[in-house]
Amino acid sequence: MKKSLLVNGLEHAVEISPGDSLLKTLRSLGYFGVKFGDEHGVTGADTILMDGKPVNAGLLLTAQAEGHKIATIEALGEHPERGWKPSDGLHPLQRVFIDTGAIQCGYCTPGQILAAKELLERQPDPTEAEIRDALSGVLCRCTGYLKPVQAVLRAAAIMRGEPVIPIDGSSASLPPFSVMTDSEEPVFLPPSGDAGDIASTTQARILPYIQVTSEGKSLKSVGKPVPKLDAPKLAQGKPAFTADFEIRGLLHAKVLHSQHAHAIIKSIDTRKARALPGVAAVLTHEDIPRVAYSTAGQSDPIPGPLDCFSLDYKMRFVGDRVAFVAAETPEIASEALRLIEVEYEVLEPVLDSQKAMEPGAPVIHDEPEYVNFADSDPLKNLAAEIRIDIGDVAKGFAEADYIFEEEYEVPKVQQAHIEPHVVVTYWDEDDRLLIRTSTQVPFHARRILAPVLGLPLKRIRVIKPRIGGGFGGKQEILVEDIAAHLTIATSRPVLFETTREEEFFASRSRHPMRVRLKTGVKKDGTLTANEMYALSDTGANGAHALTVTGNTGHKAMALYVGDGPYRKNPNIRFYADVVYTNHPPSGAYRGYGVPQGFWPLERHMEKIAKELELHPIEFRLKNALQAGEMHPFSIAWSEGRE
């Protein structure tokens, strides 16, 4: 049906389907500043202004917007240098988001700026609480909101016509930079009416002047106040991200996921799905090569087992892949998924990491193509094993006056980047497979995908635009092969973008761990021995299993070595088993295994100090590794200088 939309003062005649969202239509018109974050308006990445009020474009049908004035980030401002065309430049809100460093990944920035614009038009002199309330509908995974709040306070002062103290390195002072001399001390800006009472309410100052050292004077950027180089385009909502891309003949991919935690596909019938008009391809494990690989974006050789397949006959978690579909529209692809008929042999799942290695436990990886790494043993559901002994732990415990033992549990956590996993694949004019993807590891992706796709490296090119947050979740090869297989099958461009629900069951998370600590202590608070055992649940696949869990002990257990003779000769033990279960796979996450060690260790140290009536900080400092001392695990693992 035909509808008319008024967007940023321009009239658009659009041909839509009744179920088309306003988000879909705006992006099809090239308004890429409107982002997809989820289907329910929770992230607020799809925030626009309708008749001056913030709304979620993803929650509105296009037909509902007819007769209303729509404003997107593209209407606010533009680069001040537009050739011969006069330009008013960036909007004050865009400028201050750049100047204050409020932009990190930038995926949420258009929504935040639009929400702030509505607030300042309604309340020119807002309180910090009012600003936080206005921004609360646009989730930001990166900044913690301190800088966006500072930016809006500063913009409010500028828009009221009040003078504001310059921020060195801001867009207003480029070029050149205005910096202090060596003789001047750094000056921190006090709270003022220019930007609200920031220091007293957020316990942070606006921005310090930067003192450039003599070493920094000879350098172009290091030691000098430099704004984020790509902040201007992010503040304008320019097409900087993977899905901000147009190409003719684009197909849309969807994945059929397993509803069983552990099962074997006995039969799969795709005839009805293939016959559906608009379906270009349906792929199952019967249609593509069976190549074992690891999804971990790590250096070669990958320090972990090869235990993944693009598509497999065995399902190992709820959400595992059953089939891929490519169709002319996302709606047709979704309908095709419903037409695929699958018969399963349901197997007993392993859902408790403590039971995974018990005799007789169901074996999750019994495929002959499995490739071991180090001490992995798939028949025992063991993805990795770590055994590190430093000194003589038994002797250390024998010399202790007290022994403290406790068990802790660290839960599974999802990265929750606002931009979901998304990829576009197509053949270029040189018959190279172009993979445009939201990844943290473009070169690892290229290397890992080559054998999976049956292509030499030179025939694959990976393009990494800006990513809308990753936090380790995109250090994994999770979606690239889906679109690539479908492009190979159809010879057409393919877009695959995960739903927010898929992010939680088919993506990755922090490794949940059960951690047992045993510590020997003398009456004066000296540690004599420290022992950690970690049982790590890697889920259905072992990507990052060894390296993440290795960090758990490597970083935490080296922090407190003991005092006196124990300082030079600590007694430390770190053992870990990383087990397969039928949970969704774990993977890389910011901190990379370290929080799973530090959190229980610090709880444990606090408990010991309390029991011995010692000052918790003094107790820690007495036993802590000090500057200049050798890291005991680095010695054990032959890392660093001798």
Please place each PLM-identified region on the residue numbering.
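Glycine-rich and small/hydrophobic secondary-structure elements
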Residues: 149-153, 184-206, 303-333, 471-521, ...
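Flexible, low-hydrophobicity surface segments
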Residues: 159-378, 403
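Gly/Pro-rich active-site capping loops and adjacent beta-alpha segments
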Residues: 62-106, 332-358, 383-386, 406, ...
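Short Pro/Gly-enriched beta-strand edge/turn motifs at strand-loop
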Residues: 27-31, 296-297, 398-413, 496-503
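Beta-strand segments within the central parallel beta-sheet cores of soluble alpha/beta enzyme folds
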Residues: 38-41, 129-136, 285, 458-465, ...
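Accessory "access/gating" subregions that flank catalytic or transport cores
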Residues: 393, 397-405, 409-414, 621-642
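Alpha-helical support elements that line or immediately flank enzyme active sites
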Residues: 112, 121, 255-286, 323-344, ...
